[in-house]
Amino acid sequence: MNIITGRLQPDEGKVEWSKNVRAGYLDQHTALEKGMTIRQVLTSAFDFLLDMEQELNGIYEKMGEADEDTMQQLMEDAGTLQELLTAHDFYMIDSKVEEVGRALGLSEIGLDKDVSELSGGQRTKVLLGKLLLEKPDILLLDEPTNYLDVSHIEWLKRYLNDYENAFILISHDIPFLNSVVNLILSLIHISE
């Protein structure tokens, strides 16, 4: 996984990603910013949509003072942004955050709890939730079932089985692997 994510260089060959591929990696060592709530971290998965909404609001403000020619262009720009927001389920952000929070047991902790007060396992759940909400083209998961109880593992199985993009995962949980993957590559370190 370290070679795939670029943290280590391979002894031979290279790893290349297509230009427009977004890969998301669950790094269990990522620091979470003190003062942010679980809800804020999960919602940050949609920052690009929130930025788009700000851009749309800026266009609406300009419309109040625009002449006829400018108004036409502003309306087209606003329409394009509105279509993008709708296509990316912008108006469902809160319900998606709630769903993932509930599914990973974060709602039981309280979505408004400061992430600096969480245990290591709880922080990992927050990072997993954010990553799942980001829906990258390729999801890279390193031991995703660590810190998850049976019901949360079952939810993750369903999520991955329905995931429309590719994912690569490392796990020692054989029943979990057998239920979510269609290709297994077993790497064994052999010392010479």
Residue locations for each model-derived region?
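ABC ATP-binding cassette signature C-motif
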Residues: 1-192
